[in-house]
Amino acid sequence: MSRKNQAPKREVLPDPLYNSKLVTRLINRVMLDGKRGTAASIVYGAFDQIKEATGNDALEVFETAMENIMPVLEVRARRVGGSNYQVPVEVRPERRTTLGLRWLVTIARQRGEHTMVDRLAKEILDASNNTGAAVKKREDTHRMAEANRAFAHFRW
């Protein structure tokens, strides 16, 4: 393990349009090669599509989607007596949002729609309706944790 100090967490500034730190983190997650402007136009374009499709506030739909994606439990490998056990642990709040955003963007990139704006909008809409691949990923994670509940006493 490294002996150096842990790097301090940088404060994320809320985005100018929705005044939300979560939206800023989504933009940062979508961003490739430092092209923040492109990433912002993708996210805001997706939010416009969501507003058109639902008639509701896009930020509320996005927050609902994130609640449906973020995992509560996950499994972590723990070595005990020469064998590895998948030990279920609770997910810290910061990691919950990080995992949720990561899964959302990764799965949106794998979708079949023509543009990233369409893919992201459709995946957020699916997640807000408790369907879609990102929600399935969370369910699979929870299922793994539930299946390995017998090893919960190995928690550290």
UniProtKB/Swiss-Prot annotation:
Span of the signal peptide: none
GO biological process: translation
GO molecular function per UniProt: rRNA binding; structural constituent of ribosome; tRNA binding
GO cellular component, one term: small ribosomal subunit
UniProt cross-references to NCBIfam families, sorted A to Z: rpsG_bact
Family as reported in the entry's similarity comment: Belongs to the universal ribosomal protein uS7 family.
Record protein name field: Small ribosomal subunit protein uS7
Native organism: Streptococcus sanguinis (strain SK36)
Gene that specifies this protein: rpsG
